[in-house]
Structures are given as C-alpha cells and as structure tokens.
C-alpha cells in the first residue's frame, strides 16, 4: 500500500441497472475513476460533476459510453448517469444545472449518510472485479 486513502466509488440505483444492462463492469468504472484521479478527466463540468468515457465491452472509448460522475478527487466518486454517444450527444442546459445541483448535495453527504444509502440499496459500492478474484 502506498499510504494514500483509497477513493470510495459508488453507483446509484439507476446507473447500476444501466451498467448491468449494457455490460459495463465495475473494473471499467474503477479504471475511469483512476484516470480522473490522475488528472485525465474527459470533461470537468464544474461543481463536482465530471463526464468520463467508459469503453464498450471489447471496444474502445470513442464508441463507448459517457458517464456523469459526482467526483471529489481521491475521496469519492458516484456514477449517476450514463448514455451511449450514439444515443445522446450532450446534456442540455437544464440537465446540466440539475446534475450540478445533485452533485453538490451528494458530495456534501457524510460517510455515515453514504453508508445508510448503501444499506438502503440506493447506492452500491463499486469494487474492482479483477482484484477480487
């Protein structure tokens, strides 16, 4: 271990269903957060909201998925929404404002409040599938 605290990664209920349906692995989500922590953020939308690309299973990022993540560097990342680039070009102004407001609220939660959300199955913790074999 390098002594750095590990980023806690979560996905909300909607995103968990989306990822399952689209075959997006937890390993891919962990990789996206690791890239963000390294400064490789695809789009910083402000207010703790970032857009990260995630590759399709067996494909590259360019034809893959766009994910919206509530993000606090090296502390917390919560996958909130995802879409295929072929399905949606970008967020409109109302959607962007709504997600920024949600990011502000969710990132302000204490760890105890996050733990409650996990117990109530409104959030699901993401673990690296490859490291848990």
Predicted regions, residues:
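Enriched for short, Lys/Arg-rich terminal
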Residues: 70-124, 129
């Amino acid at each position: 271990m390098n002594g750095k605290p590990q980023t806690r990664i979560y996905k909300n209920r909607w995103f968990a269903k989306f990822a399952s349906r689209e075959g997006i692995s937890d390993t891919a989500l962990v990789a996206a957060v690791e890239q963000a922590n390294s400064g490789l953020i695809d789009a910083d939308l402000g207010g703790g909201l970032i857009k990260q690309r995630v590759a399709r299973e067996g494909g590259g990022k360019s034809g893959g998925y766009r994910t919206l993540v509530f993000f606090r560097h090296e502390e917390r990342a919560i996958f909130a929404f995802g879409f295929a680039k072929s399905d949606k070009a970008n967020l409109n102004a109302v959607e962007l404002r709504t997600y920024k407001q949600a990011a502000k609220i969710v990132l302000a939660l204490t760890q105890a409040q996050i733990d409650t959300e996990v117990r109530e199955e409104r959030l699901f913790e993401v673990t690296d599938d490859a490291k848990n074999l």
